[in-house]
């Protein structure tokens, strides 16, 4: 059924590649059109990101996350050895993502997409160019995963406008790879040593200050005013040109319709301080294929459920990460500059009506490859609801526990586990989860 439906994914980063693989697993005819990254960049990934890549089929890319770098935090006058992160060259990482796409026999086209997406007989039409020659492609659905610089034009909501200024450096040999983050008067600084005498320094600041910077010398003058010693600027040589890119939080108002959707940074992008964009991208790409499957194969009512489900998930993830960023900015109280004032007051706190948890509700869930409404148990840690613990359906269990005493619930729990042949180890994990989420208690 799905093999006759053509889906075009624009972009082959984490969001685009993992969405394409998910769609291929559902049997769709998938084509990925991408452009190479225009500049060299390094990025830090967590162990959780590595596990996410593996679960979504990006196994070759995950294998680049091998050597971890110690991450030091010098934030708000407090110094910590926070944790470790995998620092990878994004150009090499992107090539591995392409290899993952090839493993699934997904068609890949390196080309520049021209103009906006047109509609022909109610089907999206993409025009792209290779060596000055134009081609067009008709699709049943389009996924825009071209990152925060997507040409997709639409209104978006954004936070204070920050820009990150990135410079590659040649450094003396350092014993082990490392990264650090420092809060300073006019922003914050990320430094990285990635081995083979290669290092990076990145300064994130307000738009007004960033507009005064055209080269590394301009940035260096500002860094000298920050009253901080920077280890990456001891015996260094500048490599290449300074890269300037926006790094503020923004979310498109129109994320999805019945012909196309935005995934990853195309849909919403966050301040690097708020969290890892890769994890945010995978939160979207893990559900996007099932949303598309529903849109292309189900009734209008079911399509609307899927569209609303995706939109609300993206908005929830965005709100969650922006709050995390604000909490970090509020920790710094030494500076009263424009940079810190703006970010310590955004986003404004929402007066949300608190509902009782845990509770049973009917909500959209992914089940059997589609999005449909089903009963779920809403808990403090599962605002969208849960209907499974692993592969165990838990709604009947949750209903009984919420309607009966603790003693009766414990007896029913044992009967439930016995009837479903649940092992003792899994039963204990399920019981601990039910207690933690206040379903049992």
Task: Report residues per predicted region.
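Beta1/beta-strand and adjacent pyrophosphate-binding region of the FAD-binding site
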Residues: 2-15
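Glycine-rich FAD pyrophosphate-binding loop
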Residues: 12, 24-42
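N-terminal FAD cofactor-binding segment of flavoenzymes
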Residues: 36-72
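Short beta-strand to alpha-helix junction loop
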Residues: 80-100, 210-214
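Predominantly flavin-linked oxidoreductase catalytic cores and closely associated redox partners
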Residues: 104-231
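Long, charge-rich, low-complexity alpha-helical segments
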Residues: 128, 388-441
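FAD/FMN-dependent oxidoreductases across multiple families
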Residues: 211-297, 302-326, 333
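C-terminal helical "tail/cap" subdomain of flavin- and related membrane-associated enzymes
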Residues: 293-377, 387, 395
